[in-house]
Amino acid sequence: MASLGKISSSDLETVTTRGVSEIISREEFVQLLKSGKKLRLKMGFDPSRPDIHLGHVVGLRKLNQLQELGHQVILIVGDWTAQIGDPSGQSATRTMLSHEQVLENAQSYLRQFFKVVDKSRAEVIYQSEWFGKFDLAKVIELTGRFTVAQFLQRADFAQRFAEQKPIAITELLYPLLQAYDSVAIESDVEFGGTDQMFNLLVGRELQGMMGQTPQQCFMMPILVGTDGVMKMSKSLDNYVAVDEDPVDMYGKLMSVSDDQIMSYLEYLSLIHISEPTRRTPISEAVF
């Protein structure tokens, strides 16, 4: 493992480019990596279902790479926000879950997460540690920092508003609650999919408002499902579960369309991209 602040050019290239869509801001993130500070790497998850799939693994692998460089992962269990459901990319309001359902799912999630993330270098924190102490005055003070107009700039909200589809007040609160998680743990870097960019940027802005150094936002690419068209999702039945039987997992991965193989290799493996792209003449093939 490299010591803090000591990062090779190859490690830096891998961390900041492989399986990465965008970093806001990349220059600041690189400076942090070289500063010698042990970074607090935040990833939140809403245990709205009991298991995870390879789409989630894209971000978890990146966290593990940074753990190998000496940094600390903070896993936020969204035991409050999971009851609402993340509205990112949704065309309709989600059904709210009970707190008991969320806690049960969380235990299953964590067991699977630690197949990828090093448990000894990770901290698990439940949102209820701070939201359980919130009173109405705190909620009013927090919501007063943003406007409805700002939140309606989100593409999914804007589309639903234009189509006169319902947007629950709880959904408008969701990005703000996720943002406050960053304040509560003093996050240095937050990780999420490209569909989470708005939420991550709200966290960055809220930290600045509250006197903290704004977090860096690390956006991971969306893994296309086994149908070769849509985002990997259990609701679309185009997913490969982390806890899947190996035979079933193999069968599903063999069904991945040819044009998606390179992205699967890049996002989910350590294979050098130059290796699978090199074609071997049939005369040199080993059978």
Q: Positions of the model-derived regions?
A:
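Well-ordered mid-protein domain cores that form the structural environment of catalytic cofactors
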Residues: 64-117
